[in-house]
Amino acid sequence: MTDKNPIVVMKGITIEFPGVKALDGVDLTLYPGEVHALMGENGAGKSTMIKALTGVYKINAGSIMVDGKPQQFNGTLDAQNAGIATVYQEVNLCTNLSVGENVMLGHEKRGPFGIDWKKTHEAAKKYLAQMGLESIDPHTPLSSISIAMQQLVAIARAMVINAKVLILDEPTSSLDANEVRDLFAIMRKVRDSGVAILFVSHFLDQIYEITDRLTILRNGQFIKEVMTKDTPRDELIGMMIGKSAAELSQIGAKKARREITPGEKPIVDVKGLGKKGTINPVDVDIYKGEVVGFAGLLGSGRTELGRLLYGADKPDSGTYTLNGKKVNISDPYTALKNKIAYSTENRRDEGIIGDLTVRQNILIALQATRGMFKPIPKKEADAIVDKYMKELNVRPADPDRPVKNLSGGNQQKVLIGRWLATHPELLILDEPTRGIDIGAKAEIQQVVLDLASQGMGVVFISSELEEVVRLSDDIEVLKDRHKIAEIENDDTVSQATIVETIANTNVNTGKEA
């Protein structure tokens, strides 16, 4: 493959923001007919590198060559004119237009009286057919097809401009296995036509299935370029995060189960807590310094129980005892006042506030508990923000950067920092490691253990059973909106234990099915 002339050569790319060097002398070379993965943990510089190649960011140093010609992109149009097309995780198409109109947008066929829509849709059909998408009618409204199909339409649109380079940024994050298979079939067609594909994904299985070559970044620096087939997974992980896979596997490995002393009272003790149509009545107790895992399949009631504990949803049954006193946690404000915090599973829509800075996102919940007419003094605010950015290793270390410009893992850290700033006694974390890379995931798992060791009660909700088992002292197992078991975690408990419990328990009787 290396006997081909490269389509793109990026050398010594450096991009600086105020007080932060996002990229520091990074190289990237893309070859025709290859799928090339850009690898690195969240915050490594992958998105910044893509934005340099697509003209979103101007580079401070370095050079970009496309087809042997030096390029200086002053915007995305310059990059498109050079043959670089991008399909983002959130497809940037016009849902009010048809499939064909989206494919040909900006390249419509014209006649003597303006756009010839018949010829435009015929041309769109041709481009769709070239990619094996003959089944899609170009007249179909884009809004009526799935996200997966919309991504394929976006790729067809890239082919209209005769793209030399196709950038796919996390295209599989919302796809099921069949949709991923269809996407990969299209990617292979595009690759075999001579296009260079730059692929970004945090799914290692997919990386090893579809890519030919890897470039690894870490902390904004170039680490290495390797061939995928020659690179063991543990070696790749080590290059991405600066730690070996063996080191990561030790997180939680020596964790002793938190033993409850006789007469000790829980932080939270709920009896028969439920909400009709949401989750059946549940008993749960959570002690100081204890990690309680909520495990179950999608729709089991994990999130619903977490929301009831926080007051995000109002229960219609049960009692709630907090530090030995009966309370009514009926809304999030009351929960915060009682030192209960909840980090949502949907961090983008319900968690972070993208247009606000890192500083503002960390401070907003604490300010809410004090009231808007009692602003946090600047010296105190600076100390709080600095403390949690350092403790959680938020990168880039720029508190005045809009949080939407951070990677997913760093956004999650900011969200956790927001709740830690309120000094909770109970922290409910719903899917805190979803959609982030292995390095950030390991950091957040370690944070959970550290918080528990400091005496905080933690509810850990995750669809990844392995991390529930690794981190939890007790595991509440849910199925079909019922609590079906409580497992005291020890060396005999594994993912298989939970799976067997779910598979073999009748939700109505609580006994083996």
Curated annotation (Swiss-Prot):
Part of the high-affinity ABC transporter complex FruEKFG involved in fructose uptake. Can also transport ribose and xylose, with lower affinity. Probably responsible for energy coupling to the transport system. It holds the Pfam family ABC_tran. SMART domains: AAA. GO terms for cellular component: plasma membrane. Keywords: ATP-binding, Cell membrane, Membrane, Nucleotide-binding, Repeat, Sugar transport, Translocase, Transport. This is Fructose import ATP-binding protein FruK. PANTHER family: CARBOHYDRATE TRANSPORT ATP-BINDING PROTEIN MG119-RELATED, GALACTOFURANOSE TRANSPORTER ATP-BINDING PROTEIN YTFR. It comes from Bifidobacterium longum (strain NCC 2705). InterPro entries: AAA+_ATPase, ABC_carbohydrate_import_ATPase, ABC_transporter-like_ATP-bd, ABC_transporter-like_CS, P-loop_NTPase. It catalyses: D-fructose(out) + ATP + H2O = D-fructose(in) + ADP + phosphate + H(+). It is found in: Cell membrane. It is an enzyme of class 7 (translocase). The keyword Translocase applies. Residues 8-244, 262-505 form the ABC transporter domain. Its main location: membrane. It is a peripheral membrane protein.
